[in-house]
Amino acid sequence: IAPSILLKDGKPFMVVGSPGAARIPATVVTLIVNAVDYGLDVEKTNSAPRFLCQRSDQFLSLEARFSTEAQDGMKKKGHQLQLFGDFDLFFGGAQIILVDSSGTMYGSADPRRGGTAMGY
């Protein structure tokens, strides 16, 4: 699943990958949803708060940057929350490239991990 290459009309639209063992699928899917479903730009896609819910966990793990309202809503639905730091490496360290309709590429290195997006 990592790296993943998404095509739009047969052309590259998004390239994404992250380390994180069992957490890789959740991280990659969250980033794809941020870009495809919510239309976020590459930096917002990569820096948005993350969560993880695994079948083996009794907790819904999430970054503390989720709003109090969102956290309260999750608790009301019966979730036990496990809060992590604002940009916690627990949720991966993704690298993303988004390609617009003109072919221009935009890269992002996850703020949770050291890195830089560069091109030429």
Task: List the predicted regions and their residue ranges.
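Cofactor-centric catalytic regions
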Residues: 65-120
